[in-house]
């Protein structure tokens, strides 16, 4: 049988029909180190692809149960920015198509900024609908962060077109009349919620980068508004902006305001 060049093998590997293909056994017997290294990389890539597909099927469990019940438009809901001392709380709602496949999708907190940005673009391209709700720091101070988060989620759902038939929500209840399921750690257990977590996180991070350009002395692009030593020191030195949550204890304490 013909001995392939390494370049020919690179082109051939994607065509092989698994290890039962007679050409696979021929390649395994090839003693050239370059060929064996190529095969090892190919096997690892296939293992990664298999793991990604298995993870995707795990993430789609709740969605598939609803599809089986005849429910088509399922929106995942999640938020970003409940804990920071500055900036808005952002919620997102995402309806994915039934045939969606987004390998690498996961809870946004588990992903690098570059991976989140890449998935953000993929979600935008494939989603049936995306809605975003933003509630400002002033509104958070007026309502409290829990109520503000619920209102951000309600805004995100209202922004969806077409409207969803059912909601999967990360650990909260959205104030609306739609049927919904509250899932603990939903962003790690539902594809729709994980997609919403990406949209919410990237949207809020971009917002904070814009604030960093307006208020460079606070370091918003580095800490995203969280209460880091750098941020607290900046508040003590420069005071607060309109984007700071004055009702949050660390901000009050940094300003010397009693609870």
Curated annotation (Swiss-Prot):
CDD domains: RNase_HII_bacteria_HII_like (cd07182)
MF (Gene Ontology): manganese ion binding; RNA binding; RNA-DNA hybrid ribonuclease activity
GO terms classed as biological process: DNA replication, removal of RNA primer; mismatch repair
Residues that bind a divalent metal cation: 78-79, 170
Keywords: Cytoplasm, Endonuclease, Hydrolase, Manganese, Metal-binding, Nuclease
The record's free-text note on cofactor binding: Manganese or magnesium. Binds 1 divalent metal ion per monomer in the absence of substrate. May bind a second metal ion after substrate binding.
Protein name: Ribonuclease HII
């Amino acid at each position: 049988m013909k001995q392939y060049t390494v370049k020919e093998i690179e082109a051939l590997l994607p065509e092989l029909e698994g290890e039962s293909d007679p050409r696979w056994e021929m390649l395994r017997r090839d003693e050239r180190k370059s060929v064996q290294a190529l095969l090892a990389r190919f096997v690892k890539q296939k293992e990664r692809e298999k793991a990604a597909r298995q993870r995707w099927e795990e993430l789609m469990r709740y969605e598939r149960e609803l599809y089986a019940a005849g429910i088509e438009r399922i929106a995942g809901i999640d938020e970003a920015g409940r804990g920071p001392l500055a900036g808005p709380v952002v919620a997102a709602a995402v309806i994915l198509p039934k045939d969606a496949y987004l390998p690498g999708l996961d809870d946004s907190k588990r992903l690098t900024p570059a991976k989140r940005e890449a998935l953000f673009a993929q979600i935008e391209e494939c989603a049936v609908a995306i809605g975003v709700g933003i509630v400002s720091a002033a509104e958070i101070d007026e309502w409290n962060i829990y109520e503000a988060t619920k209102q951000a989620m309600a805004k995100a759902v209202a922004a969806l077109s077409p409207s969803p038939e059912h909601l999967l929500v990360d650990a909260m209840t959205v104030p609306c009349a739609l049927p919904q399921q509250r899932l603990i750690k939903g962003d790690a257990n539902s594809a729709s919620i994980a997609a919403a977590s990406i949209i919410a996180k990237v949207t809020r991070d971009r917002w904070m980068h814009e604030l960093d350009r307006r208020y460079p002395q606070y370091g918003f692009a580095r800490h995203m508004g969280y209460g880091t030593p750098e941020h607290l020191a900046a508040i003590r030195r420069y005071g607060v902006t309109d984007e700071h949550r004055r009702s949050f204890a660390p901000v009050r304490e940094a300003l010397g305001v009693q609870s």
